[in-house]
Amino acid sequence: MGELRIEAEASVEVWTIDGEARRNALTRALVAELAQNVARVSKDRAVRAVVLTGAGDKAFCAGADLKERATMTPDEVRAFLDQLRTTFRSLERSDCVFIAYVNGAAFGGGTELALSCDLRVIAPTAEMGLTEVKLGIIPGGGGTQRLPRLIGKGAAKDLILSGRRVRAEEALRLGLAERQGTLADAKAWALEICENAPIAVSAAKHAIDEGLHLDLDGALALEQRRYAETIGTEDRLEGLKAFAEKRKPVYRGK
């Protein structure tokens, strides 16, 4: 049996980490399967959005599988972390939109996985946290870099240096999650995004992500280049035509 359970609905896939007994922890096999599927949807224009969640209602992803980690040599740990970082970065760079549905506990690498997604919906009973300092290490899957970019340096230091966990209400207040709701809400959000022109959605996603690393002048030039990518598309013409005809546009990603 695979580590991911994948279901498709229209142009959206739902990926469920299928390891409820181990609180959907990040194993080597799971990370490898995530990497394979990120590569697949990044090439498949039919899939425009992915909702990523965990099996059951107790955990989204409780972080690294510490039982597996205990059997690994230092070199194997380093190799695992390299694969983890590469996979999260590939997910982040994909043209596909990723929405994490944080259905339960998301600690350590589980929160880092959610941070790699474009958007996050959190269940009312879920908790998130980068708890690594309590184990004598630091976040190794991008948490020290993605968290401050999302919620600000001070708030990120608070969470990372204390290792404390936050419930849904605080996660929303901090901006760690954008919405609170159910899996159905996350899927509906994904479907809503998929109604828009896919080339435009991808260009906007990359303009935002890449622009954060530039000064304002450089970021505005980046926006101009990304905008230019949409000018010659059939989708842009379809959007104008549909507006004039007062109907819903049918975008084909061309």
Regions from the language model: what does each represent?
Residues 63-66, 84, 144, 153-156, ...:
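A general structural signal for well-ordered alpha-helical segments in protein cores
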Residues 1-53, 75, 89:
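Conserved CoA-thioester-binding segment of acyl-CoA-metabolizing enzymes
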Residues 20, 121-126, 168, 176-234, ...:
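C-terminal long alpha-helix characteristic of the crotonase
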